[in-house]
UniProtKB/Swiss-Prot annotation:
It is found in: Nucleus. PANTHER family: TRNA (GUANINE-N(7)-)-METHYLTRANSFERASE NON-CATALYTIC SUBUNIT WDR4, WD40 REPEAT PROTEIN 4. One of its GO terms (biological process) is tRNA (guanine-N7)-methylation. Non-catalytic component of the METTL1-WDR4 methyltransferase complex required for the formation of N(7)-methylguanine in a subset of RNA species, such as tRNAs, mRNAs and microRNAs (miRNAs). In the METTL1-WDR4 methyltransferase complex, wdr4 acts as a scaffold for tRNA-binding. Required for the formation of N(7)-methylguanine at position 46 (m7G46) in a large subset of tRNAs that contain the 5'-RAGGU-3' motif within the variable loop. M7G46 interacts with C13-G22 in the D-loop to stabilize tRNA tertiary structure and protect tRNAs from decay. It comes from Xenopus laevis (African clawed frog). Keywords: Nucleus, Repeat, tRNA processing, WD repeat. This is tRNA (guanine-N(7)-)-methyltransferase non-catalytic subunit wdr4.
Length: 396
């Protein structure tokens, strides 16, 4: 996992976190979640409350200011860090279920975590030891959570194709549903500007642009139709696994799809519409990507020889950056810690079991019908043989 915040960069792999202050000559910050405290057992139980967790980091995010960083792991920890002036761990708290997504509020005072049971909890940042508060719940597994840029709405998506826009502070007031995806919704991203636009990505291989307050779909793009350079298209579903946005020069978007060795790049036009600008083909399937505040696109490749890639838009084309001092320094740091990072988090499918099962009822019906007709034909033939035998006996 790769996350880039103002002045900092974080890479996770397995249970390990590597934090770095951009431009700093200091040694990077290391943390192994498996060495953190375990949750106390409930009364009457022995050992930890959950001894089956792997300590693998599941979700992470920087605060908007970059001053804080938070992560959750497979042992239900929520760990908060301060990144300025140097990285340090502030607190370890506990969530009730394993989390699928994490985000900060626009003001940076709250962390919102979404879990597999469909609930969203908020945790205070200033009061770093305070327990979480339940904000809202779904009846299905949540896959992402975000907050509108004005801080008024919590936006969630689940495995049942729904995007829900709820009022923060009054979650029983649902502003809208954004409906249109035909598979699970995996990514949400509010876009900067006055239009109150939301971008979503799904297992159906589409990106959709919404006016989220009304639930109106503004535009959609099918990613399969854009990857002309990609071989073996028919065996890929183009499930959207990551979206990142940069607003330094208009709105630029970078999109990853699970199992696709490349990056889709878009801009958002004033209409508004998603305008496809470029597909960057890579030799390996990238693990993650993120924009920094200077409009550079960072890509975590998962290849030890070149673990980190950096792109910049030049003459309306995204081009690889070479001879970059910061990139060289970070590449060396990642390579030195490659074993600890477990290959910087070799990609595992997040979406196994989320696709809708397809049952071909018509084929089953036709097969049963054919068997029934054959059975009736056999019975009719047997009946004719018996009748002929009776006639012969009567004549004799």
């Amino acid at each position: 996992m790769l996350r880039v915040g103002p002045g900092s960069l974080a890479i996770t792999g397995g249970s390990r976190l590597l934090g770095h202050r951009v431009g700093s000559e200091c040694c990077p910050f290391h943390l192994d979640c498996s060495l953190l405290e375990k949750q106390s057992a409930a009364p009457g139980q022995e050992g930890s409350a959950d001894s089956h967790g792997s300590d693998k980091i599941l979700a992470a995010a920087f605060s908007p200011s970059g001053e804080y960083f938070a992560l959750t792991d497979d042992n239900k920890r929520l760990v908060l860090f301060r990144t300025k002036p140097a990285w340090e761990k502030i607190s370890v708290r506990w969530v009730s279920r394993r989390c699928t997504a994490l985000t900060f509020s626009p003001c940076g005072n709250h962390i919102l975590v979404a879990d597999k049971s469909g609930d969203v909890f908020s945790f205070s940042v200033p009061r770093a030891l305070e327990q979480g508060r339940l904000e809202l719940g779904h009846l299905s597994m949540l896959l992402d959570v975000t907050v509108s840029l004005d801080g008024k709405h919590i936006i969630t998506c689940d495995r049942d194709e729904k995007i829900r826009v709820s009022c923060w502070g009054a979650p029983h007031v649902i502003m809208s549903f954004c409906l249109g995806h035909t598979e699970f919704v995996s990514q949400l991203l509010p876009l900067p500007g006055q239009e109150k636009l939301l971008l979503s990505g799904s297992g159906d291989g589409t990106l959709r642009l919404w006016e989220y307050e009304s639930g109106k779909e503004v535009h959609s793009v099918t990613l399969r139709s854009l990857a002309h350079e990609l071989e073996d298209q028919e065996n890929k579903r183009f499930a959207v696994s990551r979206i990142s946005c940069c607003s330094c020069n208009g709105i630029q978007l970078a999109v990853l799809c699970e199992g696709v060795p490349g990056i889709f790049l878009f801009s958002v036009s004033p209409e508004p519409r998603l305008t496809f600008t470029q597909y960057i083909a890579l030799t390996h399937t990238p693990i993650d990507l993120d924009f920094d505040g200077s409009a550079f696109l960072w890509v975590l490749s998962g290849v030890r020889e070149e673990p980190l890639l950096k792109y910049k838009e030049l003459d309306d084309q995204w081009q690889s950056v070479s001879n970059d001092e910061e990139l060289t320094r970070l590449t060396g740091i990642i390579q030195e810690n490659w074993g600890d990072l477990e290959g910087a988090g070799a990609p595992e499918s997040r979406f196994v079991g989320l696709y809708k099962a397809v049952f071909d009822n018509m084929a089953t019906y036709l097969q049963k019908k054919e068997l029934r007709l054959e059975s009736e034909k056999r019975k009719a033939a047997d009946g004719q043989v018996v009748l002929a035998s009776k006639v012969q006996k009567t004549e004799s």
